[in-house]
């Protein structure tokens, strides 16, 4: 163990096997908080390697609660967070829209660690049950096209790292792990990352995890598609990885100011998103959500991004998404 720790402190990367061993100790509470703080900080300063990410993922999944295997295609839309953008919860709003479009979505979610409002903080405002049983979540997925898997419920061993993460208040390797340890193991994933340096490594890890089709995005220090700048995309499809850039024109929409999608507290984000998903919100927000849904639709074989964006906007403007949320809150 000391050898592994010394490697980290000297700025050296670990192998997949070494990381797996280390994270098994972390997941079973055998690494104290002081050691854990120094490990996470040292890795963050140096930068996480692909081997470290995949080793940590395998260790976390070993101790996670499983979710039933599905007999149909489904996806997750999730970001690493840690981007300090303080935007409204675009991925969560996009998940609601995607489900209303008829897509099956199993969203892995958590409360905020390094930002003001996490996905679960918003879901609580919408009165959605975060502690639903596997059976209830499965029924919700079957009947309403979407369910939410609350990370602490499925990763009980994260209790050993939660205090350190909250105390550090910086992005760590666990930000990267979040999108990769969905207990349902979705074959389709739209993943936002906080840095372009993570895009290809994230795609490679998803490939090693047997992802069928995944799209990794980053735009101007933001872990989602934005309309104030171009969006970097790395796509995994048919075991091939390609990278390209998208701009608002590719979706058939215009540029907007970055401040147009700023969020705030859970209550503030709830009010904004509720208004938007009732079909009454600002174009900047509804169109930002729509372009993220456009890429989500692409995962399911719908290649025309302009058509996808129009479809998402039509659903948003109809108010049907808010009706979906009400149904979820009453389920």
UniProtKB/Swiss-Prot annotation:
Transmembrane segments: none annotated. Anthranilate 1 binds at residues 79, 110. Pathway: Amino-acid biosynthesis; L-tryptophan biosynthesis; L-tryptophan from chorismate: step 2/5. GO terms for biological process: L-tryptophan biosynthetic process. SUPFAM superfamilies: Nucleoside phosphorylase/phosphoribosyltransferase catalytic domain, Nucleoside phosphorylase/phosphoribosyltransferase N-terminal domain. InterPro entries: Anthranilate_Pribosyl_Tfrase (IPR005940), Glycosyl_Trfase_fam3 (IPR000312), Glycosyl_Trfase_fam3_N_dom (IPR017459), Glycosyl_Trfase_fam3_N_dom_sf (IPR036320), Nuc_phospho_transferase (IPR035902). Anthranilate 2 binds at residue 165. Coiled coil: none annotated. Mg(2+) 1 binds at residues 91, 224. Its EC number is 2.4.2.18. It comes from the Bacteria. Homodimer. This is Anthranilate phosphoribosyltransferase. It comes from Buchnera aphidicola subsp. Schlechtendalia chinensis.
């Amino acid at each position: 163990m000391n050898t592994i720790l010394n490697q980290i402190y000297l700025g050296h990367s670990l192998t997949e096997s070494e990381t797996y061993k280390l994270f098994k100790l972390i997941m079973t509470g055998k690494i104290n908080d002081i050691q854990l703080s120094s490990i996470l900080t040292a890795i963050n300063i140096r930068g996480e390697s692909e081997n470290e990410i995949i080793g940590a993922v395998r260790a976390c999944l070993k101790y996670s609660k499983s979710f039933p295997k599905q007999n149909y295609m489904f996806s997750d839309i999730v970001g690493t967070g840690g981007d300090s953008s303080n935007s409204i919860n675009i991925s969560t709003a996009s998940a609601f829209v995607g489900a209303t479009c008829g897509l099956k979505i199993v969203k892995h979610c958590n409360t905020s660690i390094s930002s003001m409002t996490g996905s679960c903080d918003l879901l609580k405002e919408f009165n959605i049950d975060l502690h639903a049983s596997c059976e209830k979540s499965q029924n919700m997925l079957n009947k309403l096209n979407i369910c939410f898997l609350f990370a602490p419920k499925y990763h009980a061993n994260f209790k050993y790292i939660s205090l350190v993460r909250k105390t550090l208040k910086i992005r760590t390797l666990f930000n990267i792990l979040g999108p990769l340890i969905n207990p349902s193991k979705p074959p389709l994933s739209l993943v936002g990352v906080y840095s372009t340096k993570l895009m290809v490594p994230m795609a490679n890890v998803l490939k090693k995890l047997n992802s069928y089709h995944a799209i990794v995005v980053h735009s101007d220090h933001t872990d989602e598609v934005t309309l104030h700048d171009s969006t970097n995309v790395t796509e995994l499809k048919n075991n091939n990885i390609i990278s390209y850039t998208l701009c608002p024109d590719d979706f058939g929409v215009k540029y907007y100011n970055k401040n147009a999608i700023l969020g705030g507290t859970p209550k503030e984000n709830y009010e904004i998103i509720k208004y938007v998903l009732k079909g009454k919100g600002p174009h900047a927000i509804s169109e930002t959500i729509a372009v993220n849904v456009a890429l989500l639709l692409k995962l399911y074989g719908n290649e025309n991004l302009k058509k996808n964006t129009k479809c998402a906007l039509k659903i948003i403007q109809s108010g049907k998404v808010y009706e979906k949320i009400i149904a979820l809150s009453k389920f």
